[in-house]
Amino acid sequence: MPEDKWLNSKSLVPAYISPDSSVHGIVTAKGEIIKLDCVFPVLHGKNGEDGTVQGLLQLAQIPYVGCDATSSGVCMDKAVANAVADAFGINQAKWCAFTQYDFNKNRQECIDTAVNKLGFPIFVKPANAGSSVGITKAHDIPELIEAMNVAFNEDKKAVLEEFIDGHEVECAVLGNEEPIAAEVGEIKAAAEFYDFDAKYNNPASELCIPADIDLEKRNEVKAQAVKAYKALGCEGMSRVDFFVRNSDGSVLLNEINTIPGQTPISMYPKLFEAAGVPYKELIDRLIGCALSRGGKF
C-alpha cells in the first residue's frame, strides 16, 4: 500500500458488501461470494466513521468492530455530540453552531452571538469532518469570517468553541456494556494547535504517555471518558479527547473519535500498551467485542 500503489494494482477486483443478510459478505464483480466473519473498519472521516458503512454492515448483519451506526453518526457531528454531552451534564468548552445557510442569511447576528458567548480567540471546526481537517483559530472578526468559509468548504455546518488554555489529553476506551479506560496521554503540538498538518506532517509534535498532569487528574479524565463513552452510546472502542484547563484544573470534553488510529505508533494502542495490554491482545479484544454483539444492534 505504500504511495497508494494498491489503487492501480492489476490484482484489484471490483466488489461490494451485499446488504442481503443471507449473503453475509462481499460479492465480487464476477458474482463470487466471500463470507465475512467480522469487519474491522479502518476508515476516517465522512462515509467512513459517520455511520454510513456501519449502517450497511448492520443491514447485512455482519459483526464489525466499533460503535454502531447511531453512535457513529452522533459522534461524527460535533454539534449533535456537544448537545448530547450537555444533556448528560458532561463539562465541555463553551460552544455554538451555525449552518452555512443561517450564517449567510444572518451573518452579523451569528457573529455577535459567537463573540459575546465565546470571546476571542475562537476555534472554528466543520461539524462533520475527520483528521482535524478545516479547523481554524480566529483572533478577530475578519479571521472569524474566513474561518467560517474554510469550515463550510468541508461541511454545511460549523461548530465554534472557546479557546482553552490548558493540556490537550486523550483517553482510550474499550468495551461494550462495561467499558474500561486505559492510560491518559497528552498531545504537545509543535504548531499553534493540533491541526491536520501538525498531526500528520510535523514530526516535532509530541505524544506523551502518561499525560503531564497529576494522577488524581488522570483518574478524573478516565472517569469522564467512560461517562462520555456511555452517554453517546459508544461500543467497541473510542478515543475520548479532553482539555484540562490550566487556571482551575477543570476537565472539559473536546470530542470522541469512534475510529481512532490503530497503527502500532497511534495514541490509542499506545495508551493500552501503557496500561498493560499489548497490541495483539488489544486487537483480539476489539474483535471479541464485535463478535459478542453478533450482527444484532
Regions found by a protein language model. Name each.
Residues 29-33, 74-167:
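Active-site nucleotide/adenylate-binding loops and adjacent lid/helix of ATP-dependent enzymes
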Residues 63-64, 92, 122, 279:
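Hydrophobic beta-strand scaffold residues
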Residues 136-223, 249-252:
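Phosphate-binding site of ATP-dependent enzymes
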Residues 89, 214-297:
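ATP-dependent carboxylate activation and anion-phosphoryl transfer catalytic cores
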Residues 55-64, 140-141, 145, 274-277:
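A glycine- and small-aliphatic-rich helix-loop capping segment at beta-alpha/alpha-beta transitions
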Residues 1-70, 74-76, 80, 99-110, ...:
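ATP-binding N-terminal substructure of ATP-dependent carboxylate-amine bond-forming enzymes
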